[in-house]
């Protein structure tokens, strides 16, 4: 190991994609894509291979120039060590400049090395199959390759890779908006022109009618003069046959005044010049339409907001009314259940009081009835009588009272459980 290799230290965390350096590289060749990029001094072809990191969604691309097969060492390092710091990348690029033969190209960014140096780096980075596939891939662009960019400096990353810019989408959106505005302006122009043409047609028709009336009046005047002049004027005014023929020939050659006026009117219909005030009208109509649309939108928004507020307030009032009604019903149910429970409890309390009184009375009567303790003689006991059978009266009465109290307690518990069940059953429908 040389001193340069000792001073070189690669990052510890590698891309898990590059595990086995002995894989077959032939399946990776179809994944390579060729692309032509336009530069100021001419087009250049690049071959790229997309290598994804299994631990992240950010892809990396290995790049190769088609003209000399040089490979981007920067893209190799970043793909092999995606979590490396900028200092580690700078140290590795410095080591490559000192120990390998980098190629300088001002058109692309990053550090590029020839194929032999790229294969040496691939061994260190454990990515030999990917570099072999990139070197063997064809440099002819496929039919589905991305289009070339107009400028190279803006469309390249620090790895020498063209960026996926969104300029195409923005330009398409701008074109669509321009087309829509142009269509709107054309429609407004058409409406205004139609209106103006209608007015001009009305004026032209009125002029035609006036000219026709003038022609008719001109025709009627000589007829009236002829009638007033009599036969003498008719004889004088009658032209000869030769004159009639000459006039007929001239009338055929030269158009009449009526024909000239109608032709002028038709020319005016065909060649109607656009007035310079049309642009002002178009602009004013467009501005009016935009202001009307904006006012309508604002009105609609205010109406929607007011309706939403009204609906929210109505829902809130209905919810409050419903909650108050439920609370009142629950209170009524609780009071009713409490009154129903209190009745059997009062009865039980009275029974307990009666039992206590009866127990006290029995105890007092037993105490009064029992004689004072006297020493009995042996003669009072029979010889064959069992001692255990001789139970005092006091003890038997107490046991009976205890058993009665026990059974009464059980009854009270049962009644309490029934009352609680009835109360819960009455409250649950109001809660759910």
Curated annotation (Swiss-Prot):
Superkingdom of source: Eukaryota
Compositionally biased region (Basic and acidic residues): 180-228
Membrane topology, from the record: Peripheral membrane protein
CC per GO annotation: cytoplasm; membrane; nuclear envelope; nuclear inner membrane; nuclear membrane complex Bqt3-Bqt4; nucleus
DNA-binding recorded as keyword: yes
DNA-binding feature ranges: 73-94
Subcellular location: Cytoplasm; Nucleus; Nucleus inner membrane
Skewed-composition ranges (Low complexity): 139-152, 163-172
Residue ranges constituting the HTH APSES-type domain according to the UniProt record: 38-147
Record keyword Membrane present: yes
Cysteines paired by S-S bonds: none
Sorted UniProt keywords: Cell cycle, Cell division, Chromosome partition, Cytoplasm, DNA-binding, Meiosis, Membrane, Nucleus
GO biological-process terms attached to the record: cell division; meiotic attachment of telomere to nuclear envelope; meiotic telomere clustering; meiotic telomere tethering at nuclear periphery; mitotic telomere tethering at nuclear periphery; telomere maintenance; telomere organization
Listed Polar residues bias regions: 229-241
InterPro entries per the UniProt record, alphabetical: Bqt4 (IPR037548), HTH_APSES_sf (IPR036887), KilA/APSES_HTH (IPR018004), Tscrpt_reg_HTH_APSES-type (IPR003163)
SMART domains xref list: KilA-N
Function field: Connects telomeres to the nuclear envelop (NE) during both vegetative growth and meiosis. This connection ensures clustering of telomeres to the spindle pole body (SPB) when cells enter meiotic prophase.
Subunit structure: Interacts with rap1.
Name the UniProt record assigns to this protein: Bouquet formation protein 4
Species lineage: Eukaryota, Fungi, Dikarya, Ascomycota, Taphrinomycotina
């Amino acid at each position: 190991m040389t001193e340069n290799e000792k001073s070189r230290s690669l990052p510890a965390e590698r891309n898990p994609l590059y595990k086995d350096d002995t894989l077959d590289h032939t399946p990776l060749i179809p994944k390579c894509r060729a692309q032509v990029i336009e530069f100021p001094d001419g087009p250049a072809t690049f071959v790229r291979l997309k290598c994804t990191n299994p631990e992240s969604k950010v892809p990396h691309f290995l790049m190769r120039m088609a003209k000399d097969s040089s490979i981007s060492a920067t893209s190799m390092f970043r793909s092999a060590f995606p979590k490396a710091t900028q200092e580690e990348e700078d140290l590795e690029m410095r080591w490559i400049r000192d120990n390998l033969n980098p190629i300088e190209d001002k058109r692309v960014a990053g550090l590029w090395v020839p194929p032999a140096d790229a294969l040496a780096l691939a061994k260190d980075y454990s990515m030999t199959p990917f570099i072999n596939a990139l070197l063997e891939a064809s440099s002819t662009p496929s039919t589905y390759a991305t289009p070339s960019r107009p400028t190279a400096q803006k469309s390249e990353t620090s790895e020498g890779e063209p960026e996926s810019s969104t300029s195409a989408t923005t330009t398409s959106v701008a074109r669509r908006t321009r087309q829509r505005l142009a269509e709107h302006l054309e429609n407004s122009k058409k409406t205004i022109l139609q209106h103006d043409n209608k007015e001009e047609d009305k004026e032209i028709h009125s002029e035609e009618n006036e000219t026709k009336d003038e022609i008719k009046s001109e025709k009627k005047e000589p007829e009236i003069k002829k009638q007033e002049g009599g036969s003498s004027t008719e004889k004088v005014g009658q032209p000869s046959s030769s004159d009639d023929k000459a006039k007929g020939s001239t009338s055929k050659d030269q158009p009449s005044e009526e024909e000239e006026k109608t032709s002028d009117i038709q020319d005016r219909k065909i060649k109607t010049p656009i007035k310079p005030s049309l642009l002002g009208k178009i602009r004013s109509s467009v501005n009016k339409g935009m202001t009307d649309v904006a006012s309508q939108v604002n009105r609609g928004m205010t109406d929607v907001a007011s309706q939403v507020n009204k609906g929210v307030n109505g829902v809130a009032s209905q919810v409050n009314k419903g909650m108050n009604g439920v609370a009142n019903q629950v209170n009524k149910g609780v009071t009713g259940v409490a009154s129903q429970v209190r009745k059997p409890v009062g009865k039980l309390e009275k029974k307990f009081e009666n039992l206590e009184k009866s127990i006290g009375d029995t105890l007092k009567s037993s105490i009064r009835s029992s004689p004072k303790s006297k020493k009995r003689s042996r003669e009072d006991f029979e010889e064959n009588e069992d001692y255990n059978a001789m139970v005092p009266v006091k003890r038997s009465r107490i046991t009976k009272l205890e058993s009665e109290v026990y059974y009464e307690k059980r009854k009270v518990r049962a009644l309490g459980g029934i009352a609680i069940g009835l109360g819960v059953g009455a409250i649950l429908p109001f809660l759910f």
